[in-house]
Amino acid sequence: MSRIGKRPITIPAKVQVAINGTNIVVKGPKGELSRTLRDNVSLSQEGEILHVNRRDETRTSKQLHGLSRTLVANMVEGVSQGFQRRLEIQGVGYRAQLQGRNLVLNMGYSHQVQIEPPDGIQFAVEGTTNVIVSGYDKEIVGNTAAKIRAVRPPEPYKGKGIRYAGEVVRRKAGKTGKGGKK
């Protein structure tokens, strides 16, 4: 029995939900999201409460029950509050800046790396070393933040690179010398 799938989803006042079979459209102040769920689950709405139900007790239905509920809950939260992901840049000379909507990264390469935001995504830069990726679709926010981090992932010896805020980088010991030249 999926404990996550059994939890009801509360719909905020400014959010409208339209259910058409396995299709769901969620509209809110931040934007509009739609998704087609699998046939193994069904949606039912009672006032401001949304329930995700299984159609049968097969193993696949049980697996998709909690997943579908979480996806719908993320849609509701995204269009009402939105999501954001913070990234930190560490390293001498590494910095970020905005050019229009695009994010420009100086990461020690011979060229600047320009990242164009997908639809519904905004970049913000605090100082020159903190980047905030925000939007209403949790999946796209996470994928965009992962693309930015992939430009220069943190290396294990000095920890230089782009990391998520609060990420702990596993450090390695460097080479130990023999005691000098002879």
UniProtKB/Swiss-Prot annotation:
Gene3D superfamilies: Ribosomal protein L6, alpha-beta domain. GO terms for cellular component: cytosolic large ribosomal subunit. GO terms for molecular function: rRNA binding; structural constituent of ribosome. Keywords: Ribonucleoprotein, Ribosomal protein, RNA-binding, rRNA-binding. NCBIfam families: L6_bact. This protein binds to the 23S rRNA, and is important in its secondary structure. It is located near the subunit interface in the base of the L7/L12 stalk, and near the tRNA binding site of the peptidyltransferase center. HAMAP family: Ribosomal_uL6_B. This is Large ribosomal subunit protein uL6. It comes from Nostoc punctiforme (strain ATCC 29133 / PCC 73102).
